[in-house]
Amino acid sequence: MNKIDFRLEKTFGYTTGACAAAGSYSALYFLKNNKKLDFVEILNLKGDSLIIPIKNIEKQGNTAISTVEKFSGEDIDITNGMDIKIKVTLENMDNNCSKSSNVKIIGGTGVGFITKSGLQVKPGKPAINPKPREMIETNLKSLLKDNECVTVKISVPNGDEIAKKTLNPKLGIIGGISILGTTGIVRPMSNDAYKESLAPQIDVALANNFKNLIFVPGNIGTKHAKILLNAEEDQIIEVSNFWDHMLDKAKEKGVKDITVFGHAGKIVKLAGGIFDTHSRVADARNEILCAYTSLATQDVKILQKILQSNTTEDIVEILIEKGILTEVFEKVSKRVVERLSLRWEGINFSCIIIDMEGNILGKYV
């Protein structure tokens, strides 16, 4: 069993789920012992000990409200520094408690509401994932007597505004953020959490019976896929830079048909076997386009211009002037399909490459 003291720890952070578990524990402890805690020590589901600071706590009658400030460590995200408020009401079992459990967990203002199938939580329920629920229940039950029960209400001030900057609206989670976290720990400087937040898009698409999924890098692809392909929101999967991760997930979930669609600046990299398209990982756009242009022309001056270009848009203009734009990008599109088909066997791929305005530069379908 490991122990992380977040009063001292600056590298690791703690999840929204850990905030909710810590806040609910401190509130119930206050109700039971009439003592305010500046921090609590709770267990995650692996048995690790997490020491989490409590920002504020108040009590009135059989109800206490605890506030925990979300801390993301070095892996700063949109939720870092936000307050999570947990209201705990303590009652006897013969009052308004469920017979099946002595811990009832509900969502308040700023916690999202599920509207689409395919996620870990069913439609009509608050966006509080199963693992955080289990962590809350496990820690509270250590304080409860057999004849006692609690209602835990989780709220996030400004959660609805914060959620607009996340994938929640696309996933059909409306009105607030999600309470997440398997271990309760946010690992530093990794993309793991963000990658995992992208994967549920595939579940939503499959739950809505889409057979062909459209994988796009981001907003530009999403916007133009709706126009050019008449695609529906839930059919479009935003992968960010993580093509390898998302295609692994797609194969794992049984997806058979994928259209790769998006701006040339990102899609071209796939032709070179670059499946994490972030610029800090690799670029090579100019080199890749130069190689495929050389199959259409041996004009050395054109090839040199391409290598020295600052943007993909500049290269597009060069190819238009030379009259070989479509030829080059159709070759690139074909190579994208070949690359992906070799790595992710069993999936039928097609590829459409566009510019910023949504004009099709090349395709292989």
From Swiss-Prot:
Enzyme class: transferase
Single GO molecular function: cobalt-precorrin-5B C1-methyltransferase activity
Keywords per UniProt: Cobalamin biosynthesis, Methyltransferase, S-adenosyl-L-methionine, Transferase
Keyword field contains Secreted: no
EC number: 2.1.1.195
Catalytic activity: Co-precorrin-5B + S-adenosyl-L-methionine = Co-precorrin-6A + S-adenosyl-L-homocysteine
One Gene Ontology term from the biological process aspect of the record: methylation
InterPro entries: CbiD (IPR002748), CbiD_sf (IPR036074)
Pathway: Cofactor biosynthesis; adenosylcobalamin biosynthesis; cob(II)yrinate a,c-diamide from sirohydrochlorin (anaerobic route): step 6/10
Family: Belongs to the CbiD family.
Name of the molecule in the record: Cobalt-precorrin-5B C(1)-methyltransferase
